[in-house]
Amino acid sequence: MSRPIRAFINCAALRHNLAVVRRHVHQARIMAVVKADAYGHGLLRVARALDAVDGFAVLELEAAIQLREAGFSQLILLLEGFFSIEEIEAINHYRLSTVIHCHEQLSMLLAHKKTGKPDIFLKINTGMNRLGFRPEEGNSVLNRLRQWHTDISITLMTHFACADDLLEADHVDQQLGSFARLEEKREGCIPRTLANSAAILRYPGTHADWVRPGIILYGASPLPDKTGIELGLQPVMTLTSRIIAVQHLDFSDRLGYGGQFVADQPMRVGVVAAGYADGYPRHAPTGTPVLVNGRRTRLIGRVSMDMLTVDLSGINEAGAGSLVTLWGEGLPVEEVARSAQTISYELLAALSPRVQTVSSIP
């Protein structure tokens, strides 16, 4: 029998969360961000549940090809673009869309033979300072692309650095201003994509032609002051395991690596088959919430590679075989992330391949 840790993926929740996005964006087209194996939820499983979207965004060419070969006909965008001439050929062959964010990519594309109708998302750096051309370069790059290929589709794209933070609204306005100045100088109407998950929720004026929801599709909040549940979302991943042993600590007994937890009274401890090699955060401290048989308790001691330990005080019926919920249904992943001083994105995307995923809920 295999280890009892499981990640249950609720595909109905995915569709519910997509409906929430649609209510926010009205007429904008939706490009579901399914990078990092759909944030740890399984690329094809998620894409099939979200097959009503207008497009998908991925990172690797291999993931884009996997989607296309699985029969998805929607737009499929490579968020970091291409890295070689050979990849441009594959993009053409599989009818993929690509970001262009730097002069090196532009030079590779312009040196490539003209085939088909290229679909380019031109990334503009409006203030995140990660990827993209400077706004003052935008029209020059647009003109070079149009001179290279008269039958080319171009969408302008940018990414917000601080849309999740209400105290940084001025920074969002500055980025919008940079984008608007580029638009004032160009000729004709070009589609735009600006809004990530946080902007979808907080800045309706950024929705434009395409929105790019990521974390909200998986039921977690992009906003630091709210959980997904508070936003009307449903958790898609519920990570569970089982207690595999029970230990009895006496007063002053120490627990686990480093002996950092010291019992201040006699207590029962559940040893759970889940550790940092499964994707649970090693730095989660004592006090991080967990559920045992649906009842709230706490992580105690240091998380090890394959196991962690939980406080069974007051849960007298718990023992070997009892169900432990690490996050998901009944325990928001944002709460666990906050305790571990990280973000829900990291916890979901870090799920280990050794954890079996099941398209259901426990």
Swiss-Prot record:
The biological pathway it contributes to is:
Amino-acid biosynthesis; D-alanine biosynthesis; D-alanine from L-alanine: step 1/1
* Reactions this protein catalyses: L-alanine = D-alanine
- Please provide an example of a Pfam family that matches this protein in its UniProt record: Ala_racemase_N
What Enzyme Commission number does this protein have? 5.1.1.1
Question: Where, per the database record, does this protein carry N6-(pyridoxal phosphate)lysine?
Answer: K35
Q: Which NCBIfam families does UniProt cross-reference here?
A: alr
HAMAP family given in the database record: Ala_racemase
Tell me its family: Belongs to the alanine racemase family.
User: Which protein, by its recorded name, is this?
Assistant: Alanine racemase
Q: Which organism is it from?
A: Nitrosomonas europaea (strain ATCC 19718 / CIP 103999 / KCTC 2705 / NBRC 14298)
Its organism's taxonomic lineage begins at: Bacteria, Pseudomonadati, Pseudomonadota, Betaproteobacteria, Nitrosomonadales
